[in-house]
UniProtKB/Swiss-Prot annotation:
Subcellular location: Cytoplasm
Database matches in InterPro entries: PCMT, SAM-dependent_MTases_sf
Keywords in alphabetical order: Cytoplasm, Methyltransferase, S-adenosyl-L-methionine, Transferase
Similarity section: Belongs to the methyltransferase superfamily. L-isoaspartyl/D-aspartyl protein methyltransferase family.
Alphabetical list of Gene3D superfamilies matching this protein: Vaccinia Virus protein VP39 (3.40.50.150)
The keyword S-adenosyl-L-methionine is annotated on this UniProt entry: yes
Protein name in the entry: Protein-L-isoaspartate O-methyltransferase
Annotated signal peptide: none
SUPFAM superfamilies: S-adenosyl-L-methionine-dependent methyltransferases (SSF53335)
Xref: HAMAP family: PIMT
Length: 207
């Protein structure tokens, strides 16, 4: 999976590659989907949610430029797979999931791998996690109509934010770097498709 789907498509950060090799993706999918766990495609995980394709996980993680000592916020725990990759690469991971069954399942999977540096909160991810801010990096695994200001506010100067922004059906992956004066530099990376980011500062669940 890593050689053909990730390295071949341009991901070169050695720490990302090592994390992808270390974390078993099949642990984070339902048993019936285990045979497809290492294909480069999103897979359903229940509750109308998906586990992201491995390439997108690798790309988004690479864009965070993690060195090992960071405090990272993830919005949208989902299966827990992205949080597991972050846990291998960073010091502390804080992840927010609004759907209780997914949060509980992710916690169980992370614990089974001994990844105890991940904190999961069941809440509205669009408001971030103010009590634990600021963060060195923030990654959002659902598509937003725009970038919530809360994420910018909770990012350290020099911090990186990676988030899909667009419509409910297609987005552009955006990388934001917060400057020392509080301003931001924004870069569009590539087109993508994620489930919608639901919450106070995202999409309505009825949209």
């Amino acid at each position: 999976m890593v050689e053909s789907q990730i390295i071949a498509r341009g991901v070169s950060d050695r720490r990302v590659i090592e994390a992808m090799l270390k974390v078993p993706r099949h642990v984070f999918v339902e048993e019936a989907m285990a045979a497809q766990a290492y294909s480069d495609t999103p897979l359903p995980i229940g509750e109308k949610q998906t586990i992201s394709q491995p390439y997108m996980v690798a790309l988004m993680t690479e864009l965070l430029e993690l060195k090992g000592k960071e405090k990272v916020l993830e919005i949208g725990t989902g299966s827990g797979y992205q949080a597991a990759i972050l846990a291998v690469m960073a010091d502390r991971v804080y992840t927010v999931e609004r759907i209780r069954p997914l949060a509980l399942r992710a916690r169980k999977a992370l614990d089974s791998l001994g990844l105890l540096n991940v904190n999961i909160k069941m809440s509205d991810g669009t408001v971030g996690w103010e009590d634990e801010a600021p963060f060195d990096a923030i990654i959002v695994t659902a598509g937003a109509p725009d970038i919530p200001q809360q994420y910018i506010d909770q990012l350290k100067p020099g911090g990186r934010l990676v988030i899909p922004v667009g419509t409910q059906f297609e987005q552009v992956l955006v990388r934001v770097v917060k400057q020392e004066d509080g301003s931001v530099e924004r870069e569009n990376i590539t087109g993508c498709r994620f489930v919608k980011l639901v919450g106070k500062f995202g999409w309505s669940s009825d949209d």
